[in-house]
């Protein structure tokens, strides 16, 4: 396979509203990011991905864009952005931005003109339909709950919004829409950014005719993913997108590819004809949709991640992640954010970080930041969470039971302010932040962990150093071992010069690792999260709860 700078990179994701406030208004901003670039550089990351900075009314925290070529005033100005981009490049790092083109804000000039009249020149820039029998055009449910259609009194038609009603879907069947989007993308790339993470891109193609979903349960609105997620014909749109934008620049692109199966991976992220440099697949995150007190199926976890490794071996590239701004904190879901917080955060990091692909670290993940449990739904900001709460309680679910779901799976778990130190407001701001801070910030923070060589932060630094030092962790092959073990996730990475073993117990009870073909010795142990006893030529070792070991042989 060809070499590419993004294959060797480690990406650090920033959610700007919660990263660092520079002007005391309780909201993170661009100048705040500039003050923390040295922190990211010292960690060892080489690429920064920043969630939307564009002008937005913030119905969905920036994913409802009002102006693609302007900066939200809360975050700063375009001049601030240009300074940030220059700083990042001066540090020999790169910057990728979120690209949100399935939908815009309903306050975008395109939509304002579109809704002004049935005869507007931009009417078909969005998806407008007449109602059916006094109801919505079809029975599709929005991803955020409720109908996927909103009635507009001025023109007596409905517009489609797969997400919030303030996020109308663009009509990608319209060539003028596509060309306007391409012009905007190229404007940013000409400015000098280094790529995009492409949001919700699997939803741009809708099933022809917009038919009703089958509805055997007689629901008011039916989850409609089969008719708008990775739908037939989407590759034609994506191929044109790539040809008119991405392929013209030496950039990194990451597609948010919800609904894409491992067997389709080459079409999306294949080196020969794939659309993107890599994609985020979400199959393993489906394992989080379990009962609140149910443990994760480790065998299924291994199988899913291995399927993706195998599907792209020799033909494409994986994006490796456990957290982002839309997911809960991994240590609170996959690990143990109580007694074994430090150990489990490190074990999880070792497992995902050293697979074949480009690893992503979400802000605070390198500290083992945890989920938060605010008592009231009013303490939360996320529009999807609030819709969930309204829907569940309206159907009779108790406040307590709904909050258990919020505490485990809510998106705001990862959106609380970055915990920089033990000072007021966790060093994030000098004023009360836009959302509450996790109360554990007084002991779980960046300053404390930088001063503790046994911290999660320093373990991440060590993982990054390993990856930078040994090519086997970048280009080596991947081989799962012990696939049916219900506690241990173990795999090999191999190239012509090295073999590496990554083995981690992902449970709170001891687990016996046994493999006769891998004699384990202390002199080959390059990293572990728990101090080990001297050992030589062992064919089995007892791994303590959440113990992880990385061995390397020449």
UniProtKB/Swiss-Prot annotation:
Entry protein name: Probable oligo-1,6-glucosidase 3
GO molecular function: alpha-amylase activity; oligo-1,6-glucosidase activity
PANTHER family assigned: ALPHA-AMYLASE FAMILY MEMBER, OLIGO-1,6-GLUCOSIDASE 3-RELATED
UniProt keyword terms in alphabetical order: Cytoplasm, Glycosidase, Hydrolase
Enzyme class: hydrolase
Protein source organism: Bacillus subtilis (strain 168)
InterPro entries: Glyco_hydro_13_cat_dom, Glyco_hydro_b, Glycoside_hydrolase_SF, Malt_amylase-like_C, O16G_dom_2
Catalysed reactions, as listed in the record: Hydrolysis of (1->6)-alpha-D-glucosidic linkages in some oligosaccharides produced from starch and glycogen by alpha-amylase, and in isomaltose
């Amino acid at each position: 396979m060809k070499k590419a700078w993004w294959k060797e990179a480690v990406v650090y994701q920033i959610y700007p509203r919660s990263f660092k406030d520079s002007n005391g208004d309780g909201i993170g901003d661009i100048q705040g990011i500039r003050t923390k670039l040295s922190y990211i550089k010292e960690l060892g990351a080489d690429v920064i991905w920043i969630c939307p900075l564009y002008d937005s009314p913030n119905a969905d925290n920036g994913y409802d864009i009002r102006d693609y070529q302007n900066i939200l005033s809360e975050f700063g100005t375009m001049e601030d952005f240009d300074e940030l981009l220059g700083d990042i490049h001066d540090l020999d790092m790169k910057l990728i931005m979120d690209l949100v083109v399935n939908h815009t804000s309903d306050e975008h000039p395109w939509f304002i003109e579109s809704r002004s009249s049935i005869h507007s020149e931009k009417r078909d820039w969005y998806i407008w339909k007449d109602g059916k029998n006094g109801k919505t055009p079809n029975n599709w449910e929005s991803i955020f709950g409720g109908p996927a259609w909103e009635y507009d009194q001025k023109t007596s038609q409905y517009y489609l919004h797969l997400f919030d009603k303030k996020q109308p879907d663009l009509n990608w069947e319209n060539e003028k829409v596509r060309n306007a989007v391409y012009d905007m993308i190229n404007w940013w790339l000409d400015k000098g950014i280094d790529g995009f993470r492409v949001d919700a891109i699997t939803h741009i193609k809708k099933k022809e005719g917009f038919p009703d979903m089958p509805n055997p349960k007689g629901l008011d609105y039916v989850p409609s993913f089969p008719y708008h997620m990775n739908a037939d014909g989407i590759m034609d749109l994506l191929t044109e997108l790539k040809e008119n934008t991405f392929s013209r620049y030496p950039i990194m692109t990451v597609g948010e590819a919800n609904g894409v199966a491992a067997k389709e991976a080459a079409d999306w992220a294949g080196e020969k004809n794939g659309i993107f440099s890599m994609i985020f697949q979400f199959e393993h995150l489906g394992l989080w949709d379990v009962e609140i007190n149910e443990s994760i199926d480790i065998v299924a976890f291994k199988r899913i991640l291995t399927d993706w490794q195998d599907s792209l071996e020799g033909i494409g590239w994986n994006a490796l992640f456990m957290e982002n701004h839309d997911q809960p904190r991994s240590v609170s879901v996959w690990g143990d954010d109580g007694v074994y917080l430090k150990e489990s955060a490190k074990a999880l990091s070792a497992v995902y970080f050293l697979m074949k692909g480009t690893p992503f670290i979400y802000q605070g993940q390198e500290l083992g930041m945890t989920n938060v449990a605010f008592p009231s739904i009013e303490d939360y900001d996320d529009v999807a969470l609030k819709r969930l709460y309204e829907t569940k309680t309206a159907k009779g679910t108790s406040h307590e039971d709904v909050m258990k779901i919020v505490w485990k799976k809510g998106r705001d778990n990862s959106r609380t302010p970055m915990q920089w130190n033990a000072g007021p407001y966790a060093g994030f701001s000098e004023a009360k932040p836009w959302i509450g801070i996790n109360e554990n910030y007084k002991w779980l923070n960046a300053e404390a962990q930088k001063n503790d060589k046994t911290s999660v932060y320093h373990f991440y630094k060590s993982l990054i150093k390993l990856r930078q030092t040994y090519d086997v962790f970048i280009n080596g092959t991947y081989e799962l071992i012990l696939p049916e073990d219900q506690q241990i996730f173990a795999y090999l990475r191999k190239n012509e010069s090295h073999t590496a073993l990554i083995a981690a117990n992902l449970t709170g009870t001891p687990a016996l690792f046994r493999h006769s073909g891998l004699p384990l010795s202390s002199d080959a142990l390059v990293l572990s999260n728990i101090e080990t006893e001297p050992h030589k030529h062992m064919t089995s070792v007892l791994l303590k709860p959440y113990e992880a070991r990385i061995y390397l042989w020449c």
